[in-house]
Design a protein with these regions (language model features):
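Terminal connector regions
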Residues: 494-569, 573-574
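Glycoside hydrolase catalytic-domain context in secreted enzymes
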Residues: 1-502, 512-520, 524, 575-1014
Length: 1014
C-alpha cells in the first residue's frame, strides 16, 4: 500500500514536471522568437560593447551630442516648445464683435465634458503620455479668469469620460439641473462669458463614424450617427445658451474645437446657436492648453492657418462617397476573406479638399459649361489656409523673379552640416517677395501663402490631365510685427510645382502652354478671387468677394514635356509606373472602370454613390502572390551571379564610416556576411534593426511615434538617460500637439525646432530610428489617424515634414516616414485594395514623401498595410525600387507595418525593395532558406542588408562603438534563467520517470530490469 502511494506521488510529480517542461520550453521559444521586444521590456541588450584586447581605454564615444544636461532640462524645453507650437498653430475661426480676447478677471462658465477631459492626442501606436497635462479648469483659472459654475464642473469631473466612439455629453436639461448650487441657485447665466469646449478623439484601428455606406456606423444613438457633427445634446445645449444670451444672462459664447479632425461647422454661423467666437486648437499635447489660455487672454495673438478645408457639413465633401471599405462583387466565389476582397476607389483624383471646392467655384464664376449648381458658401465653412487675427495686415509690393538656386539655398533652414552634405543640385525656382504691414492695434504674426494656377487646356482635356484652380506652392511667416511695423517675406517656389503629370500620353511631368499665375493670399479662396480679378471677374459674376490683382503675377509658357522628363530630385528618367493602381489602366480590369472627377464636366462626373467593382480571376490572382512570383523574378544581369558569402577579412562596420555607399570597399565588406546573417537582418525588424556581432553591428532601438517619442527614456542602452544614469530616466518623451496644428503654424523655423526636440528625446531614450513622421493625407475628416498626419495637401505635408525631418535627423536619428503609401483610412487597412490614378498619386500622395527625401534626405519609410490596386504596397517593386530609390532617391531602408497579416511574405518584400519586417516571428529565416541557392534573392538580401547597415552606421545607433571596441553577443539574465528552468524541469522529469520505471520493474519482480534502471 505504501509503495503504491509512493508510485502515485511519482506519477503526479512526473506529470507536473512534464507539463512544466512543455510550458517552460514553449515560453522559452516564444521569448526567443520575440527577443527584441523582451529586451526592450526588460531593458536588456543581446550585445555589449567591449574594448579590443590591448586597446587603450577611452571614454564613451558619442557621434551626436545633446544640447541638454539632463532629462529634467530636456522635459522643460519640450514643454515650453509644445506651448509655443500650440500658440502659433491655433486658428481663430470666428471673432464677431471682437469677442476675443476676454479680459483677465472676467467671469467665465466652462461648458462641455471636454473641459475636464481634454483631447491631448490620439490613440494607438502614436499615442503619447499626457498624464500630467492640465485641463481647461486648470488653465483658465491660471490665466486669471473667475470660473463661476463650480457645481457643473464637479458634475463633469464625476461623469464618465468621452471615448473615441461616444461623446458622453449630457442633455441640456441635465446641465441646467447640475449647474445649481447647494442653495438651488443657478450658477450658469449670471452675466458671464461661456467657453464651450467640443472634443473629438480619433486613433489607430478605427475611422470615425459617418452616415455613408461602407463605413462602420456604430450602435450608440449619441453618435447621431455622425461623430463629426454636433449631436442632439450638443445642439440643444448651444441653443439653450443662445437663448440665455438673447435674454441678457450671458455676455458671449466662445466655442473651442478640441479635435484633430475637422468637424462640420455650419452651426458656427447659424444665428440659432449664437456663437460669437470660435477657435480650432486641435489635440493640444502635453502643455498646449496653456497656449489656449494665452490666446483667450490675448497674451498670444493667434496666427494659425487651416491645413484642411472645413465644410459646412462634412457630408457635402464628395470624397465621402468613396470613403470606407467596399466588397468586390462576386468576391464570394473566390473565398478570399476580408484582407483580400475589400477595396476603395479615389474617384476624386486630384480634386481633394480645396482643389475641389475652389476649382468648382472658379468654374461657376467663369461660366464654364457643366459646372452645375454649386454655391460656395453653402458648402465651405472655412477654406484651406484660413485664419483670423486680433489685428489686421496688409500685403503689398509683390515681386517675383525667376532664378536658378541650389538645393542648399532652397532649404535655408538646414544646419550648416546638412547644407555641406547636401547634393549640389541646381533647380529653377520663382522667388516671391511681398511686404507685410501690421495695420491694426496689437502685435501679431502673419502667414504668407503662395498659390499657383496652371492653365486648363485642350491638351489636358484630350489626355485627361486635371488642373485645380489653385494649388499651394509655398509659404512663409513674419516675425512678431508691432502695430505699423512691416516685413518683407520671401518664399521660394520650385518651377516643378507648376508642372502636371501626364500619365496617358508622355508619361512625364509637363509644363502646359498658356498663362500660369502665382498669387499671395490669406487662404485658398482669396487666392482664386485674386486670379479671377485679373481675369476681369467681379462680384457681379458670382464672386464671394473682390480679389486683389496687385498680388498676382502672370507667367507665360509654351508646352514643355522635356525639362521635367527627368525626376525633380535625382535626374532619373520619369516613366509611367503605376498603371496597375488605376482601375482604368489595370491589365486585369475586365469590365471594371471608373469615371474620375473632371472639371470638363462636373455634373457628369461628380455623382452620388461609391464606385462598384467586380472581383475577377486576375484580381484574385494578384492579391494572392505566391512562390511562382519569386521564381519568375529574373533580376538584372548582375543579379544572376551568386554574391560572395562568408569571406571574412576582419573589417568592422565602424571602419566603413568614411566610405560612400557605392564605394568598392563596401563590396569587400559585404562579402564577409554569411547567408544566415543576411537573412537574419532581413527577417528581423520589430522596432529594431538586428545585431550582427561578427561585423560589430549593434541591435538598435527603432520605435514610435509621429507626435513625439512614446517610450520611456530608459528603453535604449546607449541612450543618454541610461548611460548617464539619469534619475528621471523612467519618464516619457514630450507629447506634441497633433501634426495638423504643427502644419498650421506655417513656420519652418519653429517646426525645425520641433524636429530637433524629437531628435533629442530620441537620443535620450536610445532610439536610433523613429517610426514617424506620419505623411498620409487627410483625405477624409473621418480618418482615425488624422492626428498623426499634417494636411489634406501633399505639398504642405511635404514642405512641413522636410524641416521637421531635418531637425530629427540632425540628432543622428533616422526617420521612417509612414505609411507608404495611400494608407489614408483605418477601416480594413490590412489588405484593402486602394485604387488611384497616377496623376493624383504623384501630385498629392507621393509628393508628401518625395519632398522630405529630396530636400532633407529622409532616410527610411514604413510601408503601408494596404494594396495599390491589387498589389500590397510592401511588395510593389515599381513603388519601392523604381520610384522610391530611383526617381525620389531615398538612401535608407524600408520596414513593413506591423507584421500580423497573412499576405505579408518576406521574400516578396525583399524582392520588391521592402528591406525588413516589423514582425513578431524572431530569428526564423526558414522562408529565406528556401531560396538560399537563388542568386536574385540572395543579391537582394545583400542589398537590403547593406541599406540597413549603411543607415545605422551613420546614425546615433553606433554611439559607444569606436575602432578600439567591438560588439559581442551576450546571454542576458532572463535568457539564462529560461534556459536553466528548461533544463531543470527536463532533468527532473527524467529523474521521476526513471524512479517510476524502477518501481514498476520492482513490482513485476524483474530484478535485471531494476538493476539496469539503477
Amino acid at each position: 500500500m505504501k509503495a503504491s502511494k509512493h508510485r502515485t506521488l511519482k506519477k503526479v510529480l512526473l506529470n507536473i514536471m512534464a507539463v512544466l517542461c512543455v510550458i517552460v520550453y514553449t515560453g522559452n521559444a516564444i521569448a526567443a522568437a520575440n527577443a527584441g521586444e523582451v529586451h526592450k521590456f526588460l531593458k536588456t541588450s543581446p550585445t555589449k560593447i567591449v574594448m579590443k584586447e590591448g586597446a587603450e581605454e577611452e571614454g564613451y564615444k558619442r557621434y551626436f551630442e545633446s544640447t541638454y544636461a539632463s532629462v529634467e532640462e530636456l522635459k522643460a524645453a519640450g514643454n515650453a516648445l509644445v506651448r509655443e507650437v500650440e500658440g502659433e498653430g491655433i486658428v481663430l475661426l470666428k471673432n464677431a464683435g471682437n469677442t476675443l480676447p476676454l479680459a483677465k478677471g472676467s467671469k467665465v462658465s466652462l461648458v462641455g465634458l471636454t473641459a475636464l477631459d481634454p483631447v491631448y492626442g490620439g490613440t494607438g501606436s502614436g499615442a503619447v503620455d499626457a498624464s500630467d497635462a492640465p485641463n481647461y479648469v486648470d488653465v483658465l483659472t491660471g490665466a486669471g479668469y473667475e470660473l463661476v459654475n463650480q457645481p457643473l464642473l464637479t458634475y463633469y469631473k464625476e461623469t464618465d469620460k468621452r471615448t473615441p466612439t461616444d461623446m458622453m455629453e449630457p442633455k441640456w436639461s441635465k446641465i441646467k439641473r447640475e449647474a445649481k448650487d447647494e442653495n438651488d441657485e443657478m450658477t450658469l447665466g449670471n452675466g458671464e462669458h461661456i467657453v464651450y469646449v467640443i472634443g473629438r478623439v480619433g486613433g489607430e484601428g478605427d475611422d470615425m463614424t459617418k452616415a455613408i455606406e461602407g463605413a462602420w456606423t456604430g450602435e450608440d444613438e449619441d453618435l447621431a450617427p455622425d461623430y463629426l457633427t454636433l449631436n442632439e445634446n450638443e445642439r440643444d445645449t448651444l441653443m439653450g445658451l443662445a437663448e440665455m444670451k438673447a435674454d441678457g444672462d450671458i455676455a458671449s459664447i466662445t466655442v473651442i474645437i478640441n479635435s484633430a479632425n475637422p468637424i462640420s461647422v455650419g452651426f458656427l454661423n447659424d444665428p440659432e446657436y449664437g456663437v460669437d467666437a470660435a477657435l480650432w486648437v486641435g489635440s493640444v499635447g502635453q502643455t498646449g492648453l496653456y497656449a489656449v489660455g494665452d490666446v483667450l487672454t490675448g497674451a498670444i495673438n493667434p496666427s494659425g492657418s487651416l491645413p484642411d478645408t472645413w465644410w459646412v457639413d462634412n457630408q457635402l465633401n464628395p470624397v465621402q462617397n468613396n470613403f470606407g471599405s467596399y466588397t468586390y462583387a462576386d468576391a464570394a466565389k473566390y473565398n478570399l476573406g476580408n484582407r483580400y476582397d475589400q477595396y476603395v476607389v479615389y474617384q476624386e483624383g486630384i480634386y481633394l479638399g480645396y482643389k475641389y471646392t475652389e476649382t468648382r467655384y472658379e468654374d461657376v464664376v467663369l461660366g464654364t459649361p457643366n459646372a452645375g449648381n454649386y454655391v460656395y458658401g453653402n458648402v465651405v465653412g472655412y477654406p484651406f489656409g484660413y485664419g483670423q487675427s486680433y489685428t489686421t495686415f496688409e500685403m503689398s509690393d509683390l515681386t517675383v523673379s525667376k532664378d536658378q538656386k541650389t538645393a542648399k539655398e532652397v532649404i535655408a533652414i538646414a544646419s550648416e552640416a546638412d547644407k555641406a552634405a547636401a547634393e549640389d543640385r541646381t533647380e529653377t525656382v520663382y522667388t516671391v517677395s511681398v511686404k507685410v504691414t501690421n495695420t491694426g492695434s496689437v502685435a501679431g504674426k502673419k502667414a504668407v501663402q503662395v498659390y499657383a494656377q496652371k492653365p486648363y487646356t485642350e491638351y489636358d482635356k484630350q489626355w485627361q490631365i486635371e488642373k485645380a484652380a489653385v494649388e499651394l506652392a509655398g509659404y512663409g511667416k513674419t516675425q512678431l510685427l508691432q502695430p505699423g511695423e512691416s516685413e518683407v517675406v520671401t518664399v521660394t517656389v520650385p518651377e516643378y510645382f507648376l508642372t502636371s503629370y501626364d500619365a496617358l500620353n508622355t508619361g512625364v511631368f509637363v509644363l502646359s502652354e498658356g498663362t500660369h499665375y502665382l498669387t499671395v493670399a490669406d487662404n485658398s479662396h482669396e487666392a482664386v478671387n485674386n486670379i479671377l480679378n485679373v481675369k476681369g471677374k467681379t462680384t457681379a459674376d458670382g464672386m464671394t468677394a473682390a480679389g486683389n490683382a496687385a498680388l498676382v503675377h502672370a507667367i507665360e509658357y509654351t508646352f514643355d514635356a522635356e525639362t521635367y522628363s527627368k525626376a525633380y530630385g535625382t535626374g532619373e528618367a520619369v516613366t509611367s509606373m503605376f498603371d496597375e493602381a488605376d482601375v482604368n489602366r489595370y491589365t486585369g480590369r475586365g469590365d471594371n472602370s471608373v469615371v474620375y472627377y473632371s472639371r470638363s464636366n462636373w455634373e457628369g462626373t461628380v455623382t452620388p454613390g461609391y464606385v462598384k467593382l467586380t472581383m475577377n480571376d486576375q484580381i484574385a490572382a494578384d492579391v494572392m502572390l505566391d512562390d511562382a512570383d519569386v521564381a519568375a523574378e529574373v533580376g538584372t544581369e548582375a543579379e544572376q551571379t551568386m554574391p560572395t558569402l562568408g569571406k571574412t577579412n576582419g573589417t568592422q562596420l565602424i571602419h566603413m564610416m568614411d566610405y560612400a555607399y557605392d564605394a568598392p570597399e563596401w563590396d569587400t565588406f559585404m562579402d564577409q556576411l554569411t547567408f544566415a546573417e543576411l537573412a537574419k537582418i532581413c527577417a528581423n525588424g520589430l522596432r529594431m534593426t538586428y545585431n550582427i556581432a561578427s561585423i560589430g553591428k549593434p541591435q538598435t532601438v527603432d520605435h514610435n511615434g509621429p507626435s513625439g517619442v512614446t517610450q520611456a527614456y530608459s528603453i535604449g542602452d546607449n541612450g543618454y538617460a541610461k548611460v548617464n544614469n539619469d534619475p528621471n530616466m523612467n519618464m516619457k518623451g514630450t507629447c506634441f500637439p497633433c501634426n495638423g496644428i504643427v502644419a498650421a503654424t506655417m513656420n519652418d523655423e519653429l517646426v525645425y525646432r520641433v524636429g530637433q526636440l524629437i531628435g533629442e528625446d530620441s537620443m535620450w531614450a536610445g532610439y536610433a530610428g523613429l517610426y514617424g513622421t506620419g505623411l498620409n493625407i487627410h483625405r477624409s475628416p473621418y480618418a482615425g489617424r488624422v492626428f498623426e498626419y499634417y494636411s489634406e495637401d501633399g505639398t504642405l505635408t511635404g514642405l512641413i515634414d522636410t524641416v521637421e525631418t531635418l531637425g530629427i535627423q540632425e540628432k543622428g536619428v533616422y526617420v521612417y516616414n509612414k505609411h507608404f503609401v495611400l494608407n489614408d483610412q483605418e477601416k480594413n487597412r490590412a489588405g484593402i485594395g486602394t485604387w488611384c490614378n497616377e496623376q493624383a498619386l504623384r501630385e498629392i500622395y507621393l509628393r508628401a514623401f518625395e519632398l522630405p527625401i529630396i530636400n532633407a534626405d529622409a532616410k527610411c519609410v514604413m510601408t503601408a498595410f494596404n494594396r495599390l490596386g491589387a498589389i500590397w504596397a510592401g511588395s510593389y517593386r515599381e513603388l519601392l525600387t523604381d520610384w522610391l530609390r530611383g526617381e525620389a532617391g531615398m538612401s535608407g531602408f524600408a520596414v513593413t507595418d506591423m507584421y500580423d497579416t497573412g499576405y505579408m511574405v518576406k521574400v516578396h518584400e525583399v524582392l520588391a525593395g521592402n528591406d525588413i519586417p516589423d514582425n513578431l516571428v524572431g530569428e526564423d529565416i526558414s522562408e529565406f532558406k528556401n531560396y538560399e541557392n537563388n542568386p536574385v534573392v540572395v543579391n537582394r538580401l545583400r542589398e537590403s542588408s547593406k541599406r540597413v547597415l549603411y543607415t545605422v552606421l551613420h546614425s546615433r545607433g553606433m554611439d559607444g562603438i569606436s575602432s578600439n571596441s567591438e560588439v559581442v553577443s551576450v546571454t542576458t539574465w532572463w535568457q539564462l534563467s529560461l534556459n536553466i528552468a528548461q533544463w531543470t524541469t527536463l532533468a527532473l522529469a527524467v529523474v521521476f520517470a526513471a524512479l517510476l520505471m524502477l518501481d514498476i520493474c520492482k513490482e513485476k519482480g524483474l530484478r535485471k530490469c531494476a538493476k539496469k534502471a539503477k
